[in-house]
A protein has these predicted regions:
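Metal-dependent phosphoester/phosphodiester hydrolase catalytic core
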Residues: 1-384
């Protein structure tokens, strides 16, 4: 545990930084976090590279489980900003009489666990992970925990699926007003992109030659993707669930993701509806860690070329359900190998009777400057 707590301490508040209030400020992570609100969710690197994508035997080993235990506590204290003693224990379900290779935990009543904390995060009840939501005017934000219950075959466990369904059903119908009570745009925060180029040949290569190595980041990165064959069914379930919500509540859904060291834009859509039914199009906005240099080595550049080539192919998830990478706004490529960040902004106060647009703006680093890349997501078209 000292390792995880010490790592957070040195990264979040280095001893060599200038004191607060100094004339010469330290332009570092502490200043950034002190200046900007954050919504945090863990991914594999908050535990160790590829957590959840190894074999059942490795995932259940005492060493892996102990590392997960301490990483969970450190994440709870630093990123979720809660006292360590308030973290409920994860307990495996005992009501299952058959063997399961997936981690199936008892659900947690988070509202009770955090009742004494007035600043407690709005974690969804009846799920063992940290999935939580925020309501921001006409925007609803779902921050999904994709690590607590992850395995080779599973991303979200049954209790979490139930909690997400209950939350989506309770979203207020879009009244197309601001201020108002309805939701116009739903952002689903997924640490890894839901819509991304599918690297089938690379997956087959890894499966053929073996990839069960704790330090082999290329292998576990492929297994982590929603596009991996083992997660394709659950990816389709997620997209269909959100499309159903979009239709019922008359709102737009967008995915916001990172982790893949590139900037990209994709879409998942139903092909059996009219062009005016724009609720049937989910946008995928992909950015990356703002301090991470993007694909700089020769091997990474070759991988970037492969990504752009594979991205041209449309992915068929079902007869009338497809996923597709789009040419990056203002570019002739599908993915941008550049350090970047993404801003999302509402067009509030406009006279559009359908509601507010959601603007996505990527700022991409070049050798000497930055480039802007804008994309607008229209509100759901009004049907009179």
């Amino acid at each position: 545990e000292d390792y995880y707590l010490g790592l957070y301490s040195t990264r979040w508040l280095p001893v060599e930084r200038q004191p607060w209030g100094s004339v010469e400020r330290s332009l570092d992570a502490p200043l950034g976090m002190a200046s900007m609100p954050t919504v945090m969710m863990w991914d594999d690197h908050d535990i160790f590279d590829g957590w959840g994508s190894y074999s059942v035997e490795m995932q259940r080993s005492p060493l892996f489980q102990r590392l997960f235990f301490h990483a969970r506590r450190a994440f709870w204290v630093f990123q979720m900003q809660h006292a360590a003693e308030m973290l409920p224990e994860l307990k495996l379900r005992t009501d299952i009489s058959v063997r399961s290779d997936d981690p199936l935990f008892e659900s947690i009543e988070w509202s009770k666990a955090l009742k004494a904390d007035k600043l407690g995060l709005p974690l969804l009840d009846k799920q063992p992970g940290f999935t939580f939501t925020h309501s921001l005017g006409p925007l609803q934000l779902v921050v999904a925990d994709l690590r607590t219950e992850r395995s080779h075959e599973q991303v979200l466990g049954p209790h979490t699926w139930g909690a997400v369904h209950q939350y989506l059903n309770a979203i207020a119908q879009n009244d197309r007003k601001h201020p108002g009570v309805g939701c116009q745009h739903l952002l689903f925060m997924s640490s890894v992109p839901v819509v991304h180029p599918k690297l089938s040949l690379a997956e087959a290569f890894m499966d053929s030659f073996g990839s069960e190595h704790v330090l082999d980041s290329s292998a576990d990165d492929l297994k982590d993707h929603w596009t991996n064959d083992s997660h394709e069914g659950e990816r389709r379930r997620l997209i269909e669930t959100l499309l159903k919500t979009a239709q019922q509540k008359q709102l737009r859904v967008s995915f916001v993701s990172g982790d893949v060291h590139v900037a990209a834009w994709g879409t998942a859509y139903k092909a059996d509806v009219g062009t005016k039914d724009n609720w049937a199009h989910i946008q995928q906005f992909t950015s990356t860690a703002v301090v991470h240099p993007s694909l700089v080595s020769v091997t990474e550049r070759l991988f970037f070329h492969v990504l752009n080539t594979v991205a041209r192919s449309r992915q068929s998830l079902d007869i009338s359900l497809h996923a597709e990478m789009m040419l990056f706004p203002g570019s002739n490529k599908y993915v941008m190998a550049a350090r970047n960040w993404l801003a999302l902004e509402f067009d509030l106060g406009t006279d559009n009777p359908s509601g507010s647009k959601l603007w996505a703006t990527w700022r991409c680093e070049t050798k000497d400057a930055f480039t802007n890349h804008l994309l607008a997501t229209d509100p759901v078209h009004r049907v009179d």
